[in-house]
């Protein structure tokens, strides 16, 4: 499996994380799901109700509005994203404990170094973590 992510959406995600720094940012990732690839079509920044550099909790009202919009667009929920302002882009113990949806993709953007690093994971049984390759797409091409 591979994730295709337009560079423009990646930059939107980075901008969201930098705007919220030093707090964690969070949001939803939607698109088209095929057998061998996930095509990201849109990201939806959410409010982090925890207002924290170490935790995030999405606003349920905002989530509900996004779910309605996603249905109207004909897309599917791929997963969610959040930033790690001071740590690497890998799931923390808390991230794993809160990963209840085994089909969701968890995108984590690290701002720990000068160049942001985005990685994507699937988490099974709240402990088995597997990284999924992200292919960045520019103007419809790799």
Located regions from the model:
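Short, well-ordered beta-to-alpha junction loops that form the rim of enzyme active sites
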Residues: 83
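Conserved beta-strand-loop surface patch within small alpha/beta domains used
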Residues: 1-77, 86-142
